[in-house]
Regions:
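Interfacial loop-to-helix transition and helix-capping segments at the boundaries
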Residues: 5, 52-64, 143-156, 194-219, ...
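Alpha-helical transmembrane segments of multi-pass integral membrane proteins
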Residues: 217, 244-353
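Short juxtamembrane and helix-loop transition motifs at transmembrane-helix boundaries
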Residues: 86-91, 111-120, 136-146, 197-204, ...
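Aromatic-anchored segments of alpha-helical transmembrane domains
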Residues: 16-23, 132-139, 183-196, 245-258, ...
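Hydrophobic alpha-helical segments of polytopic membrane proteins
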Residues: 170-184, 226-249
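Membrane-cytosol interface segments of multi-pass membrane proteins
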Residues: 1-189, 320-367
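Hydrophobic, membrane-facing alpha-helical anchors
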Residues: 108-111, 132-137, 191-195, 212-226
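Internal transmembrane alpha-helix with an interfacial aromatic "cap," most often the third helix
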Residues: 76, 161-164, 169, 217-231
Length: 367
């Protein structure tokens, strides 16, 4: 089964949206929009564009939910393909996942420690040990957002990988619809417990306890199974506009779920799904054009490196350009994201090459 380019494009769009959001949130943290001006057509148009920019920019963190969905999708797809080719040895599977995740994660720590143009907002202390292990959910208030807040995602991801054999077995046994129902039920129950009868630090719901984000991950796994059953039908819905329109219609309702404790149980799943429909719909449009498709697909292929390294850079720069007008920020944003994408790509590609080289040295030579 060949790699789906539109999945890589979607990952590229998602990580760029996340990086842009962190840049925007730092730059505009204390910013105030000018008063609306509806005095004439030109002023009204400018006011509308300004409000739309502000609202859409503030939704960038929803793209993290898109990453969770696409992670479930790609992991299910690759593991199912391996199962069809002769079964799965879970020991080597775990080792492959470990070597895929941890080396680049450690390189991101090294980059944080030695790179210039980095926002270092906390001291480097003994908490870095738990961070290097990925166990940022231990003493969650002190460790989950330590040094680089984006690394919380890694702590959640390793939990999903730990339980993935159980998820995979369940999904294959009960089918996509029942699996999605079970995943949503478990995730919503966990969120209910941590929000209502036994209120805990919100970082557990964010991803410190991965089951709270299982609905998105299960949706991705179910989408992978549905795609295998009927790829043409699913791609028509997701890539040819129908899914984009559906997401656009449902998004306002999803945003209303922020306005209540019980509603908040469902908000991450709802906003992540709507954002996924928008991003994948845009990816479908981009995939019609060869050069942009290759460019965004390349960013998506190496999105892991960009995700792990971008935030301290955009915070550093964002703090220094707060007096720049919005149009100046947007002009600065484009080359900044391009440079960070290239840097993340270089780091991830180099790390993977080094790991593969070291592993090949340990393999016995054929007789």
């Amino acid at each position: 089964m060949k790699r789906l380019l539109w999945i890589d494009i979607s990952k590229g769009l998602a990580i760029l949206f996340v990086a842009y959001f962190h840049f925007f949130a730092t730059y505009f943290q204390h910013g105030v929009l000018p008063p609306p001006d509806w005095s004439n057509l030109a002023a009204g148009t400018l006011t509308t564009l300004r409000l739309a920019w502000f609202k859409i920019s503030g939704l960038g963190f929803h793209a993290v939910g898109v990453f969770i969905i696409l992670s479930g999708w790609t992991l299910m797809q690759s593991t199912a393909r391996r199962a069809e080719n002769g079964g799965i040895a879970w020991g080597p599977w775990y080792w492959a996942r470990f070597m895929r995740l941890y080396p680049m994660y450690w390189v991101a720590h090294l980059v944080y420690l030695v790179s210039p143009f980095i926002a270092r907002l906390e001291p480097v202390d003994d908490r870095i040990i738990l961070s290097l292990l990925g166990l940022r959910f231990i003493d969650i208030e002190m460790n989950f957002m330590y040094l680089n807040a984006a690394w919380w995602y890694f702590a959640m991801l390793i939990q999903f990988y730990l339980i993935f054999p159980l998820l995979f077995w369940t999904a294959r046994r009960v089918g996509p619809w029942w699996f999605l129902f079970i995943g949503c039920a478990a995730g919503f129950l966990a969120r209910y417990v941590l929000l209502v009868p036994w209120p805990q630090n919100g970082l557990w719901v964010l991803g410190g306890f991965a089951i709270c984000r299982l609905p998105e991950f299960a949706l991705g796994m179910s989408l992978a199974m549905w795609h295998k059953q009927s790829p043409a039908r699913q791609e028509w819905f997701l890539l040819r506009g129908a899914g984009f329109v559906a997401g656009l219609i449902l998004y306002p309702a999803a945003l209303q779920l922020y306005h209540g404790l019980y509603e908040y149980i469902f908000v991450d799943f709802a906003t992540g799904t709507c954002c996924m429909l928008e991003i994948v719909g845009i990816a479908g449009f981009i995939s019609l054009f060869d050069s942009p498709a290759k460019l965004f697909g390349l960013v998506g292929l190496y999105s892991y490196g960009l995700y792990l390294t971008h935030q301290p850079y955009v915070i550093w720069l964002g703090l220094r350009i707060r007096e720049v007008p919005v149009w100046g920020f947007l002009l600065i944003c484009i080359p900044t994201l391009a440079v960070l994408s290239a840097w993340g790509m270089l780091l991830e590609k180099g790390t993977n090459a080094l790991v593969n080289k070291l592993l090949s040295l340990k393999r016995p030579a054929p007789a």
